Amino acid sequence: MHLYRLGRVSWQDSQLAYHALAHLGRQGLILCSPAEPYVSVGYFQEPAQELDLEHCRRQGLPVFRREVGGGAVYLDQHQLFWQVVLKRDHPLVSLNREAFYRRFLAPVVGVYRALGVGAGVAPINDVAVERRRIAGTGAGEIGDCVVFVGNLMRRFDCAAMAQVLRAPDPEFRRSYQQYMERELTSLRHELGDQQQAALSDDELYGLLAHEFASVMGSLVPHHLDDELRRAMERVGRRMLSPAWTYQTRRARLHRKVKVRAGLYLHHWLQESPQGPVEARFTSLDGKVLEVSLRGPVAKLPRETSEYIGGSVTDLTKALSAMAPSRD
């Protein structure tokens, strides 16, 4: 199995390398970090629905739509990427989904613990410190390969992430940022700025390579050879094009944004006989934490407060029942 320890690379190469490796049907582990900040969205997402594209343009932030799942995320040099590419028929892939995630998140947890951070796997594919998220991940199938990617977070810019998010108004954006600041953590937060800064990228890459080798077997250092570079150029011509990046999907009236495992912010628009009703609510593990309604005589079958602690399903059914009759 090859180890591609690329270090600091262009933002484009930080995504194109693992896509190209998978399209070639080659296996390996890639370790890298982007030289410039950018925003990445998941395969099933449309940037126009997820991001404030005007803000991204003003800030000079490129947008990349990847071929693996997960949500929109702000990425920069303070995050070290690990990218696993395996053939679909590899023995390590023949597991149920949760077992696969747990197996390949174990090395990331191992690195954090080696640094004195009490991290663990938060079902099904997050890494957390006492429920505070400390790594993002995404997975998918590319060509004949399964790809699992994620990061080791030195620090995370919650303000920058909140600004790139498409939000109905500043209040929603502020709420999202406040939740992130409470519910996300990083090496900087856990170890302190001085201790985190004393860790070199090379040291962290070395820890990642060592921990992943305990799962993947011997990892032989390899470089970006000519075949892989040519594949990156081919993949780049497609994936860096506006046609790929900004592919449109059916507009969604209802939206939820992930903060960490189990914790979501929801924005729901519902037509009613009196006019459009807007609902905002926060959920934890499928239960409503808080909810507010806006709109003409917006009223649910029960008092709004009675939905707190109940299931998200009950609340959304009540909202859907506001729809005008088709008779």
What are these regions (language model features)?
Residues 1-50, 54, 66, 139, ...:
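Active-site loop/lid in soluble adenylation, ligation, and acyl-transfer enzymes
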Residues 49-75:
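Active-site cofactor/substrate anionic-group-binding motifs, chiefly glycine-
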Residues 72-91, 172-191:
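Residues forming anionic-ligand binding surfaces in small-molecule and nucleic-acid pockets
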Residues 79-125:
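Contiguous, small/hydrophobic- and glycine-enriched helical/loop subdomains that border
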Residues 102-121, 188, 192-205, 212, ...:
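Well-ordered alpha/beta subsegment
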Residues 130-167:
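A contiguous pocket-lining binding segment that forms or flanks enzyme active sites
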Residues 138-139, 152-154, 270, 277-295:
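Short beta-strand elements
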Residues 187, 280-327:
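Active-site- and interface-proximal helix/loop "cap" or "latch" segments in soluble metabolic
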